[in-house]
Amino acid sequence: RDGSAFAMLTEAAIELAEALVEAIPCAEQVLFAATGAEATHFALRLARAATGREKILKFEGAYHGHHDYGILSVTSRGTADLPRPAPESAGIPSRVLDEVLVAPFNDLAAVERIVKQHGGDLAAIIVEPLQRIVEPAPGFLSGLRDITRRHGILLIFDEVVTGFRLALGGAQETYGVIPDLAAYGKVVGGGY
């Protein structure tokens, strides 16, 4: 009861999950992970499973963890209006580059162009609602919500950094936009 658990949830984990569902606007269920990278990776995998689609859209400069999809295009590559996926580490399979599309942060017109071209293949758009120190432009997050709803694409908020820091309900509460999925880490686990 008070030791390590490898398969079964403890009462404390269930209580924490219930508190998270109460605090996080989009939360209906909780999957615990050991790291924020695992949380974002699980969210992407769930989006692919739910939609039956392969591709994801992320934003240039966003870091979603050290998994193959999270560490693409953390720095600028390609043109300003159409960045291209670029690995930030050796060992990322070229197939991953075919499954990830990249848009400039705060550019809804670019997102619309990409969705128009690839919408039927897009499982999810993953976004850090507050990209470290770059705030979302007015209407950007709600615009993403509208685009994803119109095209059957899941919207994922990477709240590993923003969760419980901007407000108890994270960026979802602060900006009034509710995604389909959210990934939390750092503060939720007692980290920095």
Locate the predicted segments by residue.
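Active-site nucleophile and cofactor-binding loops and adjacent substrate-binding regions
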Residues: 6-13, 31-37, 60-63, 161, ...
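Active-site core of PLP-dependent enzymes with the aminotransferase class I/II
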Residues: 107-114, 127-154
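Active-site PLP attachment segment
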Residues: 173-192
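N-terminal glycine-rich dinucleotide-binding loop that anchors FAD/FMN and/or NAD(P) in oxidoreductases
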Residues: 72-103
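Short acidic, glycine/serine/threonine-rich loops at helix termini
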Residues: 42-45, 67-72, 136-137, 165-170
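Glycine-rich loop-to-alpha-helix module at the N-terminal edge of alpha/beta enzyme cores
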Residues: 1-54
